[in-house]
């Protein structure tokens, strides 16, 4: 692909460990392969995407190896974000950092509080934030609701990110899912901290959902209010959470926002290009 990058999906997943996604009822029509993803990206006009290593592999080493292979086969269209679980202990965190040292294509780190029992400001994560600072890469943090009922949302409030954003002011931090349902709380954390961003991933359901139109209208309203609270669109990122969300649906949320065209363009790609160093 040549030419300027206009659309970047900052949040999607592809893994054989997520094969059961078809059985969840989220996307029964999906071609859950790399070719299927690239085809859906083309149809939605998405130039690049950020592939987030899933949290479901037998080991983080397995998940990283799989994600690296997918990225290497994507003809430069995917960027790699890896993950780590601090509850596995200091040695496991050190081992993962050592793996990242041998991963030159690493573009970011994703944390899954709620799915794993820790807060974003857990001191066991300090080496991870310090590593992100050294590599000059962002840390993406799950915030808001969890996909499964066993997740613990006490760990996922956006306000829990404020402390670490202050302690690691030079580390860019992304509040995934805009903290939904605590979108106003996420907006405050973004407004207060110049190193904090929020993405729009996972905010909508499949169009077949009976209340989809009303949900989409409410979501647009809440995201618009959040952007107004922040006072700028420059730290808001488009993301889908594919395969859970159809890419065209996720793009449509952004294009429907009552914003100047330059702000919609920034959310769809310009901000991500700056954050992830895409050219």
Label the model's feature ranges.
Residues 7-10, 51-53, 81-82, 110, ...:
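Active-site neighborhood of phospho(di)ester-bond hydrolases with catalytic His/Asp-centered motifs
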Residues 47-48, 58-156:
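Active-site gating/metal-coordination segments in enzymes
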């Amino acid at each position: 692909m040549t030419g300027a990058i206009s659309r970047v999906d900052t949040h999607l997943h592809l893994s054989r460990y997520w094969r059961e996604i078809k059985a969840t009822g989220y996307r029964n029509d999906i071609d859950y392969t790399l070719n299927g993803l690239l085809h859906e990206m083309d149809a939605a006009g998405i130039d690049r995407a950020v592939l987030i290593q899933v949290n479901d592999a037998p080991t983080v080493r397995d998940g990283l190896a799989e994600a690296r292979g997918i990225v290497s086969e994507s003809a430069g269209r995917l960027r790699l974000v890896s993950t780590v679980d601090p509850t596995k202990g200091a040695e496991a965190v050190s081992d993962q950092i050592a793996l990242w040292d041998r991963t030159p294509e690493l573009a970011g780190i994703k944390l899954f509080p709620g799915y794993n029992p820790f807060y974003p400001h857990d001191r066991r994560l300090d080496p991870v934030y310090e590593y992100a600072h050294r590599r000059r890469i962002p840390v993406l943090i799950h915030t808001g609701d969890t996909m499964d009922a066993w997740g613990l949302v006490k760990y996922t409030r956006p306000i829990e990110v404020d402390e670490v954003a202050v302690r690691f002011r030079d580390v860019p931090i992304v509040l995934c899912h805009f903290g939904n349902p605590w979108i106003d709380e996420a907006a405050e954390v973004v407004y207060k901290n110049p190193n904090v961003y929020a993405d729009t991933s996972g905010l909508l359901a499949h169009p077949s959902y009976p209340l989809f139109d009303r949900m989409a209208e409410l979501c647009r309203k809440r995201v618009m209010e959040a952007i107004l609270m922040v006072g700028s669109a420059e730290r808001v990122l488009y993301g889908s959470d594919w395969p859970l969300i159809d890419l065209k649906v996720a793009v449509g949320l952004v294009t429907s926002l009552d914003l100047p065209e330059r702000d919609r363009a920034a959310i769809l790609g310009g901000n991500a290009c700056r954050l992830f160093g895409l050219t």
